[in-house]
Amino acid sequence: MPITVNKLRHDTHHFFYKKIGAIFFISIFATFMNILIDMFIKPDMHIVSIMENNKFINASSLLEFIQNMNLNEKHELLKYSILKIMESLISKTTLLGSIIILISVVSEPKKKSIVSSIRTFFLFFPSLFILNFLTTFIIQIGFMLLIIPGILLSIILSLSPIILFFKKNRLLDSIRLSMYISWKYIKIIGPGVLFWMCGKFILTMLLAHFSLINKNVLFLISNISMNILFSILIIYLFRFYMIFLRS
C-alpha cells in the first residue's frame, strides 16, 4: 500500500472526529495531571516570581542572572527546574501513552477490556518515560545549537515511541529505527511534525494576546489545546507506521 501525505491526513481526520470525545478527555486528564503535580511541587515563590518577571533574551543573560544569585537561590532554582522538567515529562508521557493505547485498541479487531488497556498502559509507561527523557534531551541539544538541527531531530525521532510500543524493542533500538525510517520517509513524516510545530507557535501567539482572560484559565486552555495538537500528530505518525508495516 503506497504511503502518501493525503492518505495519512484523511485517515487522521477520520480517526480524530470518530474518537474526538476520548481524545478531549485524555487531553483534559493530562492537563489536570499537570496542574495536580504543580500543586504538589510547592516551589519557593520568590524563585518563581523572579523567573516569571525576567525576560531572558539569550543564554548569556540567563547565565548572568544565575551568577548574581546566592547559593540558596541557586539550589532552589535547580530544584524547581528539575521538578518542572519531571512534571512536563510525566504529563507528556501520560498523553502519549494514552493516545497510543487508544489507537491500538480501536485498530485491533478483538476488543480489549478497559482493565486490560489500563494494565498495558502502566506496563508501557516506564520505558516510554525513559524514551521521552532521552529524545527530549537530544532534541533540546539540537535546538541549543541551531533551530534547524532541533527541527530535524524532532522529525527523525518522532516515530520512536510508536516503534517502542509495536516492536517492544529496547530504547536505543527504537531510536535507531525511528531515525532510519523517518529519514527515509522524511517527505511524509516531516509535514506532520512541521504542522504540529507551526500549530503550537500560532496558538502561543494567539493566546499571548488574550491578556484580559484569567491567567489560570489561559493556562488551562493553552495546555488542553497543545495536548489536542500533539494527539493529532501521534494519530498521524501511528497511522503512517501501520501502513509502513503492511507495505
Swiss-Prot record:
Q: Where are the transmembrane segments?
A: 20-40, 85-105, 114-134, 137-157, 188-208, 218-238
Where does the record place it?
Answer: Cell membrane
- Cellular component annotations (GO), alphabetically ordered: plasma membrane
Q: How does this protein lie in the membrane?
A: Multi-pass membrane protein
Is Cell membrane there in the keyword field? yes
Question: Could you tell me the keywords of this UniProt record?
Answer: Cell membrane, Membrane, Transmembrane, Transmembrane helix
Q: Which InterPro entries match?
A: UPF0259
- The yes or no answer to whether the keyword Transmembrane helix is present is yes
Family, similarity comment: Belongs to the UPF0259 family.
> What HAMAP family does UniProt report for this protein, alphabetically?
UPF0259 (MF_01067)
Q: Which NCBIfam families match?
A: PRK02868.1
**The name this protein goes by in its record:** UPF0259 membrane protein BUAP5A_271
